[in-house]
Amino acid sequence: RDFPRPQLPVIPLGVDCAKFAPDAGTRARQRAALNIGDDDIAVLYLGRLSFHAKAHPLPMYLALERAARETGKRLHLIQAGWFANDFIEQAFRDGAKDFCPGVTAHFLDGRRAETRFAVWQAADIFTSLSDNIQESFGLTPIEAMAAGLPSVVSDWDGYRDTVEHEVHGYRIATLAPPAGQGADLADTHAGEIDTYDRYCGYASQFIAVDVAAAAAAYGALIRDADLRRRLGAAA
């Protein structure tokens, strides 16, 4: 008697889409609370706020500043997440002031469940320019799709499998040294000379996100409400 081979499908991380469904009332309240006007554009980053172990914010700051200048639109950058310590928080706040002074910066506590879900409603665009080797699947682009938002993300790891370029949003060219060039970093981590935290931070300094391409992607979405709707609906 033959024994039927069991099905063993691989099911990726998922989200409860109903929690992210667009709601006009919630959107109006969230935008009013943040003083985001009807004609303003809000760009959302959600996740850990860590320049060495998640995503260095400099490419995002520079690209949004350029997009704000080129489009003439009033832009808001919502960074909803959490900091590991006060030093990192101050670095993010100072960086926003120094590198995107023309963009209104909002920092929200993403550890609060009510914030983590409602803040999606305030946004017009989602972004995550991750540059870190610890980034694997990446759940937030899936949440952005559930919220009906177009995405601007780095061309990185799991993001490549979820965000189809010019269909759901834009994947921004992200460069790393050739294979094998990180052997010294791997050796110091494997030999317990460097912690995993330091290993991630050191490795991230060799990654470059194309700021000009990111600015162009932001600009295209900022200028064109129909494009935002079309890419958001495709997700």
Annotate each PLM feature.
Residues 150-153, 163, 170-171:
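Short hydrophobic beta-strand element within catalytic cores of glycosyltransferases
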Residues 16-110:
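Conserved catalytic-core segment of nucleotide-activated headgroup transferases in glycan assembly
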Residues 121-135, 149:
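Acidic donor-binding loop of glycosyltransferase active sites
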Residues 1-25:
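Donor nucleotide-sugar binding/catalytic pocket of nucleotide-sugar-dependent glycosyltransferases
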Residues 110-113, 118-123:
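Short alpha-helical donor nucleotide-sugar binding micro-motif in glycosyltransferases
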Residues 176-229:
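C-terminal "capping" alpha-helix adjacent to the active site of nucleotide-linked donor transferases
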Residues 138-141, 159:
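Short glycine/serine-rich donor-binding loops of glycosyltransferases
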